[in-house]
A protein has these predicted regions:
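Polytopic transmembrane helical bundles with strong interfacial aromatic enrichment
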Residues: 1-479
């Protein structure tokens, strides 16, 4: 297919499915915590705006959560179908870590999700709030285990290799491997920031259409406070993550910087733009700032950054891809910080909700957090190449050995099915977003004499009336 080998098609297939999948957990993590904050504020203040926002976003959360679970199952199967040699080699580490995620996180979420989505007016307020908090904690615990497994593949430790297989010898070292704290923090904050801009974009859309309600204003206000406070923190965390990567994966940093060779003892420049050429072993048309590379990456003007030519050609990541994916991530991060600062300036002037240029920026920034997450994952995963487990197993040795025809057919099927099914799901979720928050009316529906109506499935928490308009009596209730 297009002159690609089976291993390349397997990588493209996994990249496609995981790129689709990560969008949903990122929003799930952020929305779960956002819902917990909204319900907590409602219980404390009794301000109905928080309650109305809770019921509005809980419906969107239900749809997003369902799509995240389904897309995650596909990825799990691929470890066995497409990457069986990797599973055989490292399964003693990755298998238990993913099992811990199911036992501690997924079961916690599943146990309280029903109460959270369908328990309003059926359980006490404190119990319902507790359920929402447990779901939020469950999403973070899930992030913990998934990032631990992935980080171990980046910086493996706490193991022995016996008979060609990884055998864990120190589970604490496995879980808390050198890159794990930085990657966990970076990803969790990224999920919060991505959700903030998703929420802020939704509010901006309604304000631009003249729907200036207290609930919409509160959405925008909370989103911009999050952007203002957390986006700069993400930049600092990213800096520490970069220092950790320089220590443990210097070839990745060299590829990200497009830095091919050091000249004498001269400090490393920072290449702002250019086109890395893997064949010619140089970065063409580069625009650089002298010394700044050393200052940013080593916090010193006396040290140099390792160069790509210091590594064997077969051990070098594809510099062209990670060079630009990293810059997309950083550029979006800077734009997020700018948006947060602009919102503060407008807030002080009293024009946060009426400045159309700002509202248009907030609207278009809606997907920025998700795009930045994808760019960041492309950087870290492609930058790990040619290794699937850094320094231990090459990606070329990890695949199941399927034919080009098999991988081509399944890749095409995945693309078609994903765009149809998840396209429909995303369209439905955007339909809910466009409706906006409405006033919630306390009402307990009944399905028969002495029986309350009970939703039959999680996605039925996202309720719409027949005329494509919300019935306030049904907000937050099931079919």
């Amino acid at each position: 297919m297009f002159g690609l080998e089976a291993i390349e098609l397997a990588r493209i297939q996994f990249a496609f499915t995981i790129s689709f999948h990560i969008l949903f957990p990122a929003i799930t993590i952020g929305l779960a915590s956002y819902l917990a904050v909204l319900e907590g504020l409602w219980l404390k203040t009794r301000d109905d705006v928080y309650r109305d926002l809770y019921h509005f976003w809980s419906k969107i959360f239900a749809v997003n959560f369902g799509m995240g679970v389904v897309s995650g199952l596909v990825m799990a199967y691929q470890f066995g179908t497409n990457w069986s040699r990797f599973s055989d080699f490292a399964g003693a580490v990755t298998g238990p870590l993913l099992t811990y995620e199911v036992l501690t996180a997924f079961f916690l979420e599943a146990g309280f999700l029903g109460v959270m989505l369908f328990g309003w007016n059926r359980v006490g307020r404190n119990l319902h709030f507790f359920s929402t908090v447990m779901v939020a904690i469950g999403t973070l615990i899930s992030t913990f285990w998934i990032l631990s497994s992935n980080s171990w593949m980046q910086t493996p430790q706490g193991f022995e290799i016996i008979d060609g297989r990884v055998i864990p010898t120190d589970w604490f070292a496995v879980v808390f491997n050198p890159s794990f704290p930085y990657r966990l923090t970076h990803m969790a904050i990224a999920a919060f920031v991505a959700t903030a801009f998703f929420v802020g974009s939704s509010a901006a859309w309604h304000l631009l259409r003249g729907r200036d309600t207290p609930a919409v204003r509160k959405m925008l206000s909370m989103a911009m406070w999050m952007a203002l406070l957390v986006a700069p923190v993400q930049a600092v965390v990213g800096d520490f993550h970069g220092l950790n990567t320089l220590k443990h994966q210097p070839a990745k940093i060299a590829a990200i910087e497009g830095h091919w060779e050091n000249i004498g003892d001269e400090p490393t420049p920072l290449i702002l733009f250019g086109i890395p050429d893997m064949k010619e072993e140089r970065t063409k048309y580069k625009v650089e700032i002298p010394y700044l590379g050393s200052l940013i990456l080593t916090h010193s003007l006396d040290k140099q950054v390792p160069a790509l030519k210091e590594f064997k050609p077969e051990d070098r990541p594809n510099s062209l891809i990670v060079f630009w994916s990293f810059r997309v991530m950083v550029a979006l991060g800077m734009l997020m910080i700018f948006t947060g600062l602009w919102s503060l300036w407008l807030r002080k002037r009293g024009t946060l909700y009426s400045s159309r240029p700002f509202l248009y920026l907030a609207l278009w920034m809606g997907p920025s957090g998700l795009v930045a997450i994808l760019a960041g994952w492309f950087t870290t995963e492609i930058g790990r190449q040619p290794w699937v487990v850094y320094g231990l197993m090459r990606t070329a040795d990890a695949s199941s050995g399927h034919s080009v025809a098999q991988m081509s057919i399944t890749l095409v099927l995945f693309v078609v099915v994903y765009f149809v099914l998840f396209g429909a799901g995303l369209g439905y979720m955007m339909r809910l977003v466009r409706k906006g928050p409405k006033a919630y009316v306390e009402h307990v529906p009944h399905g028969g004499p002495g029986q309350q109506r009970t939703p039959a499935r999680p996605l039925s928490a996202a309720v719409e009336s027949e005329d494509d308009g919300d019935n306030p009596d049904r907000l937050g209730k099931g079919n």
